[in-house]
Design a protein with these regions (language model features):
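Compact nucleic-acid interaction/catalytic patches
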Residues: 24-28, 33-61
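Short, charged beta-turn/beta-strand-edge "cap" motif at the junction between a beta-strand
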Residues: 19-23
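C-terminal terminal-subdomain/extension
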Residues: 60-106
Length: 106
């Protein structure tokens, strides 16, 4: 369990307990932190499904398996739902994510 009150930062990959909209089941899933405010953490889904569109994040970068960051699937959780931090992505990858996210807003 992560320590409550910790500051979460953009670019951290975490394991979080998530309840998706199509199920009552809570599952542990990797996610990318976009920002944290007032103990609420806004995240982007990370999936290992290679057929999904998004930004790739590889084993070489720290994932257990090659995965996809889905900027079209964003959710907010309480910091209490975060199990642990896995790693932080590179500054270069953060810039790619920011650029892609801003492109989606146009």
């Amino acid at each position: 369990m992560m320590k409550y009150g910790r500051k979460y930062n953009f670019g951290e990959v975490i394991i979080a307990r998530v309840q998706f909209t199509d199920s009552f089941e809570v599952k542990k899933r990797p996610a990318l932190i976009l920002f944290e405010e007032y103990k609420n953490v806004v995240c982007a889904v990370i999936t290992s499904n290679p057929k999904m569109k998004g930004i790739s994040i590889t084993k070489k970068e720290g994932m257990a398996v090659n995965s996809i960051i889905k900027l079209n699937y964003i959710f907010t959780i309480s910091e209490k739902m975060i199990e642990k931090k896995l790693f932080s992505i590179s500054k270069e990858k953060c810039e790619v994510i920011k650029k892609e996210f801003l492109n989606k807003l146009d």
